[in-house]
């Protein structure tokens, strides 16, 4: 029972608690709802107030924007009106200009109509005058035919023939003048090219002689060179082919010989013997053979050096060795190898001025006198020998022709061949390049004057410019101007046929006439 009561009490207490809790929560909820409603009402009221303010602000902004837009619209309308006014003014000006142009065109049209009418009248007058002129021309032509006895065709033919002759004469004169001008310009250009080439060419060699001198330490060495009964000197002369001249010249022996290579071998051998001190036939033979080998090697080296200096490459080794032998070959005292190198250099310069192959020109110039290296060993002129060597070693056909034509033996078939001949003449005629002995020089000058004075009408002659020019004075009462030209040509032919000389000789004939009167 007690437990039931307790349980019922607990249940009642629990129900009362629940009811009380519900009521309390309900009162709290109602209080919150009331508070929320008040807050909501405040928010609504605040929102209404804010909305009214925003509405007023928006209205103000809208009014402001409307005012600005209206102002811009008015400004734009005003600008458009002004632009329309300007366009209207321009159109009015154009209209006025068109009106003025229209008036001008009307005036021109009326003027042209009047001019056209005037031209029509003038044309009619011209036609009438043409008819009259034709009639007068026919009458005059008939009258001329009657008077001259020629028809118009015959007269026309005569006039044409006369005009043709005049034109032919004038053409011949013009052609001659053109040829003269062309020759003068060609000569001037050639002189300029030659002068440029000579200015750019600096030669460093001088004339050489046909003797060599070997210095001795003392005069006792002369006896040792001669040897017992002259056996040493005979052995040396026999092995080298060179004459040894032992005279009163102190401490010197002179070697004389035409072949420069043999002379050089003899000089080197003799210097070695003098330096060694042992001089007897066996030693002489040994030194001569050693010197010969050294000279051969030197010839090869100097040939290679020359080709390198000139800029010519690809020569056959045998041809290089033959070229080196020109080192010991002279012409009128001018060293053959130096002359060939100078001709090669000049040929290259001339070819460069004319736009030709410089390398080929130098090659042809270097080999132009190659035949002189062995012309004393092989039959024929140095030109023929050089041509055969070039063909043997398969040189370029331009090189072969340059060798064959540089002395006029064959016709030059290329510009380079002509340039090589010109360079050869320049090198030979250069002052100091070639020389003669004093005796031959004097004899040549005397022979020059003798040849010149052997002609009739020659009063006297003078060899000047070291024998490079001969001036002949003729008697004016016996020789006229035309005969002066003939005498100059005849003297030139005599000189070419009877004299040997380096370079060229200028022949000048002078004819002077003087008229003298005395006033009293």
Curated annotation (Swiss-Prot):
Compartment(s) where it occurs, according to its Swiss-Prot or TrEMBL record: Cell membrane
Enzyme Commission numbers on file: 3.1.-.-
Which InterPro entries has this protein been placed in? HD/PDEase_dom, HD_domain, HDIG_dom, KH_dom, KH_dom_type_1, KH_dom_type_1_sf, Ribonuclease_Y, RNase_Y_N
User: CDD domains, alphabetically?
Assistant: HDc, KH-I_RNaseY
The UniProt keyword set, sorted, is: Cell membrane, Endonuclease, Hydrolase, Membrane, Nuclease, RNA-binding, Transmembrane, Transmembrane helix
Identify the residues that the record assigns to the HD domain, covering every copy: 336-429
Where does the record place the KH domain? Answer: 210-273
Gene Ontology, cellular component aspect: plasma membrane
| Bilayer-spanning residue ranges | 3-23
Basic and acidic residues composition bias: residue spans: 81-118
Which residue stretches belong to region Disordered? Answer: 81-125
| Biological process annotations from GO | mRNA catabolic process
Tell me the membrane topology, using the record's own terms: Single-pass membrane protein
Q: Which family does it belong to?
A: Belongs to the RNase Y family.
- State its role: Endoribonuclease that initiates mRNA decay.
NCBIfam families given in the database record? HDIG (TIGR00277), RNase_Y (TIGR03319)
**Protein name from the UniProt record:** Ribonuclease Y
Taxonomy, top ranks, is: Bacteria, Bacillati, Bacillota, Bacilli, Bacillales
């Amino acid at each position: 029972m007690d437990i039931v009561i307790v349980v019922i009490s607990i249940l009642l207490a629990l129900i009362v608690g629940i009811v009380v809790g519900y009521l309390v929560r309900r009162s709290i909820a109602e209080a919150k709802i009331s508070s929320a409603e008040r807050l909501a009402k405040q928010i609504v009221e605040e929102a209404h107030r804010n909305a009214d303010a925003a509405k007023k602000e928006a209205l103000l902004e809208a009014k402001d924007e409307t005012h600005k837009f209206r102002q811009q619209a008015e400004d734009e309308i005003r600008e458009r009106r002004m632009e329309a006014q300007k366009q209207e003014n321009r159109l009015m000006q154009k209209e006025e200009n068109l009106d003025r142009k229209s008036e001008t065109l009307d005036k021109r049209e009326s003027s042209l109509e009047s001019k056209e009418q005037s031209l029509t009248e003038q044309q009619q007058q011209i036609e009438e005058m043409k008819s009259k002129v034709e009639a007068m021309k026919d009458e005059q032509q008939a009258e001329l035919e009657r008077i001259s006895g020629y028809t118009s065709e015959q007269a026309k033919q005569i006039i044409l023939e006369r005009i043709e002759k005049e034109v032919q004469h004038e053409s011949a004169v013009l052609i001659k003048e053109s040829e003269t001008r062309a020759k003068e310009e060609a000569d001037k250009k050639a002189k300029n090219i030659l002068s440029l080439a000579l200015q750019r060419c600096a030669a460093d060699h001088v004339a050489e002689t046909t003797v060599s001198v070997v210095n001795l330490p003392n005069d006792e060495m002369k006896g040792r060179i001669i040897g017992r009964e002259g056996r040493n000197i005979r052995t040396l002369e026999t092995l080298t082919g060179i004459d040894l001249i032992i005279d009163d010249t102190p401490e010197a022996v002179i070697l004389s010989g035409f072949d420069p290579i043999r002379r050089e071998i003899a000089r080197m051998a003799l210097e070695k013997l003098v330096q060694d001190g042992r001089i007897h036939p066996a030693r002489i033979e040994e030194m001569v053979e050693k010197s010969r080998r050294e000279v051969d090697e030197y010839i090869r080296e100097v040939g290679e050096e020359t080709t390198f200096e000139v800029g010519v490459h690809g020569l056959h080794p045998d041809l290089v060795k033959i070229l080196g032998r020109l080192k010991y070959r002279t012409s009128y005292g001018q060293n053959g190898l130096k002359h060939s190198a100078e001709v090669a250099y000049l040929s290259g310069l001339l070819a460069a001025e004319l736009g030709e192959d410089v390398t080929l020109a130098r090659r042809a110039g270097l080999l132009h006198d190659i035949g002189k290296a062995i012309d004393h060993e092989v039959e024929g002129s140095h030109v023929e020998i050089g041509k055969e060597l070039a063909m043997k070693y398969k040189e370029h056909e331009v090189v072969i022709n340059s060798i064959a034509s540089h002395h006029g033996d064959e016709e030059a078939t290329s510009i380079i061949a002509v340039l090589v001949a010109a360079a050869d003449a320049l090198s030979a005629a250069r002052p100091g390049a070639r020389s003669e002995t004093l005796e031959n020089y004097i004899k040549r000058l005397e022979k020059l004057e003798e040849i010149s004075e052997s002609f009739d009408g020659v009063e006297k002659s003078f060899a000047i410019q070291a024998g490079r020019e001969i001036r002949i004075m003729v008697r004016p009462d016996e020789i006229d101007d035309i005969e002066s030209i003939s005498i100059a040509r005849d003297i030139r032919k005599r000189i070419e046929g009877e004299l040997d000389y380096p370079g060229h000789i200028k022949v000048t004939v002078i004819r002077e006439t003087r008229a003298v009167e005395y006033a009293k």
